[in-house]
A protein has these predicted regions:
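N-terminal targeting signals for export/organelle localization
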Residues: 1-48, 186, 190
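A short beta-strand-turn-helix
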Residues: 36, 45-65
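Short loop/turn microsegments at loop-to-beta-strand junctions
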Residues: 42-43, 64, 148-150
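Short active-site neighborhood of thiol/selenol oxidoreductases, capturing the structured segment around
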Residues: 58-80, 85
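Structural microenvironment flanking redox-active thiols in thiol-disulfide oxidoreductases
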Residues: 79-119, 127-134
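Structural micro-motif
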Residues: 119-121, 138-141, 145-152
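Thiol-/selenol-based redox modules, centered on thioredoxin-like
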Residues: 146-190
Length: 190
């Protein structure tokens, strides 16, 4: 009887600790900088891709950019989201859109992730979380910072035209494609 009371108290304590940690993590996302305003120019940046090349957002002027931030390579939600972007890659290309993924992982981690998962779009290493900060996409977990799961659609003039701050990895690529269809009248018929 005494052991079951201790076990119950221990389980309740663990559950309370988990809820507190989740709440702190959620609030930490809100504690960073604000995302760029829809209608404003997307902050420019240069980051290293999985192949070691410097990628500058400005180099994509003239194209639509799907800039998506995600927490971590090789995790279930991030892998699902990346697989769906890869599955739909040809449709993005038909819409004159490129996909750029950003996380705080290293370029080497991105290379391994792309190789293992068959990803053929750029993943950018924001190891010092400066770009994630600038886009209001940081989860500060105290001892570690991760990119938050946010996405920005940037038009060919470099203007943020849509943002997603609450992303379901399983549905997100379809939502972004639909938004591009609305933002680009006739894009599907090109």
């Amino acid at each position: 009887m005494e052991n079951s009371k201790i076990s119950s108290k221990r389980v309740i304590g663990i559950l309370v600790a988990i809820v507190v940690l989740l709440a702190v993590g959620y609030q930490a996302v809100k504690a960073g900088e604000k995302p760029p305003a829809v209608g404003g120019v997307a902050p420019d940046f240069t980051l290293t891709s999985q192949d070691g090349n410097a990628i500058n957002l400005h180099d994509y002027r003239g194209k639509w950019v799907v800039l998506y931030f995600y927490p971590k390579d090789f995790t279930s939600g991030c892998t699902t989201e990346a697989h769906n972007f890869q599955r739909d890659l040809a449709q993005y290309q038909q819409k004159n859109a490129v996909i750029l993924g950003v996380s705080v992982d290293t370029a080497d981690s991105h290379q391994k992730f792309c190789t293992k998962e068959g990803l053929n779009f750029k993943l950018l290493a924001d190891t010092e979380h400066k770009v994630s900060d600038e886009y209001g996409s940081v989860m500060n977990l105290g001892v570690k910072k991760l990119s938050a799961r946010h996405t920005f659609i940037i038009n060919p003039d470099g203007v943020v035209v849509k943002e997603y701050l609450d992303v379901d990895p399983g549905k997100h690529s379809g939502e972004v494609l639909a938004a591009l269809g609305e933002l680009q009248p006739g894009a599907g018929s090109k």
